[in-house]
């Protein structure tokens, strides 16, 4: 297997794994293959961010592939050890983990917390911060405990662990500021009318500096993002083709938050469980270099839909999908 040279990357030939990418864009490439093997081709300390959502450790085996919960942690750590070597010293590894229940009983699995502890104790990562993704549009689950027996509320929050290689990862929260509330906007416009400086019980001196316009408010580590893509290009073309969409897609706003906060333009972003390649699409929009890996050819072929123009013909969509599925390597820029 050949190893890439980051110093000689071009926009459409970013890697050389001894195999061609399924498709390329201006900033990135999507590969079909085992990400554990493909990861080894990166030079050590070359990646700025690995942003991914691995197959969840669900008790019912899904078509996108997952292991029994007791095997899951060891399996995931085999990837994490390689990621740790390939990250830059100021690099980050952000992982979205879905919740799970123990088999047959309404008691939660703690596999995601076992991953967290072992990532720190055994692999050497640091927990830069724990995030929680609240998806208000998530359907009630699991059905047995929520819908049928009605003894548990719906599971609508995923843990998102932000790991870093060192204690000081690259980060800039000014890139992800949230819009001010209406009340805060009024305070900024006329602080004397809406605010009286005082010292709070905590000892913080709340003065006029708190009315300064900093471009937005500091976001919390609870990210409220709906996962509803019903009108998106990807799902529309999957429906047009009569093929199944990837069953576990996170919304673009999730990787967007971390890509903006943890990287700069031209930094390299990698998704080791690419799926429908949401991470690659966001990295492309944000002018980051990107590489995504996915084992299933049908998911890779469909993921190309994310990069197509809205007015592209059905014939062209079908042609692109089938050519990727048949093993061709496509430059989407030249086709679009």
From Swiss-Prot:
Q: Where is this region: Disordered?
A: 196-215
One Pfam family from the record: N6_N4_Mtase
The EC number(s) this enzyme carries? 2.1.1.113
UniProt record, GO biological process: DNA restriction-modification system; methylation
* UniProt-recorded Gene Ontology molecular function terms: DNA binding; N-methyltransferase activity; site-specific DNA-methyltransferase (cytosine-N4-specific) activity
What keywords tag this UniProt record? DNA-binding, Methyltransferase, Repeat, Restriction system, S-adenosyl-L-methionine, Transferase
What catalytic activity does the UniProt entry give for this protein?
a 2'-deoxycytidine in DNA + S-adenosyl-L-methionine = an N(4)-methyl-2'-deoxycytidine in DNA + S-adenosyl-L-homocysteine + H(+)
Q: What is this protein called?
A: Type II methyltransferase M.PvuII
Organism name: Proteus hauseri
